[in-house]
Curated annotation (Swiss-Prot):
Name the record gives this protein: Inactive peptidyl-prolyl cis-trans isomerase shutdown
Subcellular location: Cytoplasm; Cytoplasm, Cytoplasmic ribonucleoprotein granule
Organism this protein belongs to: Drosophila melanogaster (Fruit fly)
One function term, GO molecular function aspect: Hsp90 protein binding
Major localization listed first in the record, in broad terms: cytoplasm
Biased composition (Acidic residues): 44-54
TPR repeats: 218-251, 303-336
Annotated GO biological process: meiotic cell cycle; oogenesis; piRNA processing; primary piRNA processing; secondary piRNA processing; spermatogenesis; transposable element silencing
Effect of loss of the gene: Recessive female sterility with no effects on zygotic viability. Some strong alleles (WQ41 and WM40) also lead to male sterility.
Similarity field: Belongs to the FKBP6 family.
One matching Pfam family: FKBP_C
Taxonomic classification: Eukaryota, Metazoa, Ecdysozoa, Arthropoda, Hexapoda
Length: 455
């Protein structure tokens, strides 16, 4: 009699686990069943339990093992990294880039093969995407990380890795053989430094005013902040940049060179904070950072800083000041189309606002022909003008958001009155967008496109 098997989807874990813990001492884990519907929405359902049947678009030659003879013969053609890893370079990487360092986010393509077998027991190609991990975190088997750490961006290489640095003597049958060395074919696509967000906490209190001690840790915080921005974690990025600024401001410099390095890094950090604050819809903080930048640059901020100042001022409704900031940025980069587009947008906003103001005040001081008409006070008319101005700004922001690749943007609920919140809800509905209030952070409003799925 045939058995009926239900189609399955990949199961997500409630908490992540590392391969190193799995191999060394074993781990317990729980499956998050609530994610099954999301897997179906993303097209991850499959009636097949074979990785190969799901990889129809992958070239079979790419998946085929580059060596099907004994590993001893291949080792003779390789260079020894250490007693457990042998390497053969098949494509040279970028010579002007260093090998993958510790504390880096690296993206690779790889396939792993058992001795004498043509098909891989594991391959990122079967999943149709690159594999990304952080070095130094123990999230991949030790042998693969050591191999990747020996490579430069763009490099392709083959490695024979001892079972001692892979899955140990027991393995995980039937897919992972016990006490088996493996051949790995690896390509490093690129890497970026992620820094160390906690390194600065280890500085002794008596050394926290010494520039030579603090500066490397501030650089680490800067790298961590940049990495957080790439991942869309703007609050984490802001915290990292703020801590770096605070630590540098507290330092005493011993010479002109240290002062130059401090000013250079503080300038970069404050510019990055302006970008992050604008992303977080905190324009007032962005303007505060601009004051610090003007002091650091002796009144000559960069084009990037002026552009971000323009965005912050526009968000605050200071259109004339925003246009002036954009014009100063344009003077530094006349050919920059993005700046030109913002200037045109500001000119339209200013004209529209001035026209609306003239119309409101004209109605405020004109005589009504009909006595039955209810006359509005200048204060009421001014309130209507502000409400209309808010609606225009919010609609413009929503239109710009719809035209970007971003899937969601967050706001602070406390920044809006109840009337403004109601108006925003109405506009979001008109534009077929979702406006949700976080159940965890009550102050966070999220505007998202209809195809965004939340866990």
């Amino acid at each position: 009699m045939e058995e009926n098997f239900e189609p399955y989807t990949p199961q997500l874990l409630k908490n992540p686990l590392s391969y190193s813990d799995l191999v060394k001492k074993g781990v317990e884990f729980e499956v998050d069943n609530s994610q099954q519907n999301h897997a179906r929405d993303l097209g991850l359902d499959s009636d097949s339990d074979s990785d190969y049947e799901d990889a129809l678009d992958v070239d079979g030659e790419e998946l085929r093992s580059p060596w099907t003879y004994s590993f001893d013969e291949l080792r003779a053609l390789m260079s020894e990294i250490d007693e457990n890893i042998y390497k053969r370079i098949t494509r040279t990487g970028h010579v002007d880039r260093e090998a993958v360092p510790n504390k880096a986010r690296v993206s690779v393509r790889y396939s792993g093969y058992w001795e004498g077998e043509t098909a891989p027991f594991d391959s990122s190609l079967l999943r149709g995407s690159k594999f990304v991990f952080e070095t130094g975190q123990g999230t991949v088997v030790e042998g693969l990380e050591v191999a990747v750490r020996s490579m430069r961006p763009y490099e392709q290489a083959e490695f024979i890795i001892s079972y001692k640095l892979l899955f140990g003597e027991l393995g995980c049958p039937p897919r992972i053989k016990p006490k088996a060395d493996a051949l790995f074919k690896v390509e490093v696509i690129d890497y970026s430094l992620i820094g160390d967000a906690k390194g600065i906490d280890a500085i002794p209190q008596e050394d926290r005013d010494k520039f030579c001690v603090v500066y490397p840790k501030a650089v680490d915080l800067h790298l961590h902040g940049k990495d957080s921005v790439k991942l869309g974690r703007y609050q984490s990025a802001a915290t990292a940049f703020e801590r770096a600024v605070s630590s540098l401001n507290y330092c005493r410099m011993a010479n002109d060179e240290e002062e130059r390095k401090q000013t250079e890094l503080l300038t970069t950090l404050n510019q990055n904070l302006m970008i992050v604050y604008n992303k977080m819809n905190k324009p007032k903080r962005a303007c505060i950072m601009m004051k610090a930048l003007r002091h650091l640059t002796m009144g000559n901020p960069s084009c990037k800083a002026l552009f971000q100042e323009g965005r912050a001022l526009a968000a605050l409704g200071e259109y004339n000041l925003a246009r002036n900031a954009y014009l100063q940025a344009q003077a530094k980069q006349p050919a920059n189309k993005e700046i030109s587009d913002e200037i045109i947008s500001m000119n339209k906003r200013i004209s529209k606002y001035e026209e609306a103001s003239r119309d409101i005040w004209a109605r405020a001081f004109s005589l009504k022909n009909s006595k039955s008409d209810v006359r509005k006070t200048p204060a009421q008319l001014e309130k209507e003008a502000k409400e209309q101005d808010f609606n225009d700004k919010m609609e413009d922001l929503i239109r710009r958001f719809k035209n970007t690749s971003d899937q969601q943007v967050s706001f602070s609920r406390k920044s809006y009155s109840n009337a403004q919140f109601d108006a925003t809800c109405k506009l979001a509905k008109e534009h077929n967008l979702k406006l949700t209030l976080s159940p965890i952070q009550e102050d966070v409003l999220t505007l998202s496109k209809p195809d965004v799925k939340f866990a």
